Every structure is written in structure tokens, then in C-alpha cells.
């Protein structure tokens, strides 16, 4: 049997130096949106976490255009997740020969894109089914 399901294209950023909670605040706003709409949202956000996510979304779109030869207007973010990474541990020198430990949080961000042009015939049948159920 031939696998006709198109692959999902992803970009993975590991060990990004920011808190996972701060990155999740941005990711929750872009999940399920189109590629072009996501870029507009991320460009206008005043948060520091928006820039690494912007770079990952752009990288995932470049991966999709290279591997699938798909148009960027047809890309949709179907999955975006943030996981905690290992904490970077440093020592801060203090007075009288002492030191305080500093833990910098890191996170791993995954962006998964899907090309909706593969699903045009399926989406029409889904819309017809929804209209029938609404009646």
C-alpha cells in the first residue's frame, strides 16, 4: 500500500536560553494559525521570546519549501510545543570567598507545519458534512 499522507515538516530548537513558561505564552497565540499570519503576529510582539520562535517558524517554512516544494501561503502550524530543557548552572562570586549558584532555564521548542493544499478535496467533503449536520 502506498503512503499518500503528506509528511509534516518541523523545526526543532533546543537549549534556547529562556524560561519555558515565557515561551509558552507566545506559542499559545500562534498555534493553529497560518504561516503568514504567524509572522505578522510575532513581528509585532514586544516579548524577547518572540524572536527565537520567529526564527523557528521561518526555518520550518524553509524546510517545507525545500522538501515539499510547497507555497508558503498554504502552510499552517498544526503543532507547537515547548518543553523544559536542562538548567545551565553557573556560580556567581560573592564577598569573602563565597559564591551563589545561578540556574539559567532553557527550553526546547518544536514547530510542526502542514501544507493544506494536499487536503483541498478532503476539506470540501468535511465542509459539506458540517453543513449537513447543521441542518
Curated annotation (Swiss-Prot):
GO BP annotations, alphabetical order: translation
Species in which this protein is naturally found: Cuscuta exaltata
Record-linked Pfam families: Ribosomal_L22 (PF00237)
Protein family per UniProt: Belongs to the universal ribosomal protein uL22 family.
GO terms under cellular component: large ribosomal subunit; plastid
Name this polypeptide is given: Large ribosomal subunit protein uL22c
HAMAP family reported in the protein's UniProt record: Ribosomal_uL22_B
Subunit structure comment from the entry: Part of the 50S ribosomal subunit.
Amino acid at each position: 500500500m502506498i503512503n499518500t499522507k503528506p509528511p509534516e515538516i518541523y523545526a526543532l530548537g533546543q537549549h534556547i536560553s529562556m524560561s519555558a513558561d515565557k515561551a509558552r505564552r507566545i506559542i499559545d497565540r500562534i498555534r493553529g494559525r497560518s504561516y503568514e499570519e504567524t509572522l505578522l503576529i510575532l513581528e509585532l510582539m514586544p516579548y524577547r521570546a518572540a524572536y527565537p520562535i520567529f526564527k523557528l517558524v521561518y526555518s520550518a517554512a524553509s524546510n517545507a519549501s525545500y522538501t515539499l516544494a510547497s507555497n508558503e501561503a498554504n502552510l499552517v502550524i498544526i503543532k507547537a510545543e515547548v518543553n523544559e530543557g536542562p538548567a545551565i548552572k553557573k556560580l556567581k562570586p560573592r564577598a569573602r570567598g563565597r559564591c551563589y549558584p545561578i540556574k539559567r532555564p532553557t527550553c526546547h521548542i518544536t514547530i510542526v507545519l502542514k501544507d493544506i493544499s494536499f487536503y483541498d478535496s478532503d476539506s470540501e467533503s468535511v465542509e459539506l458534512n458540517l453543513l449537513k449536520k447543521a441542518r
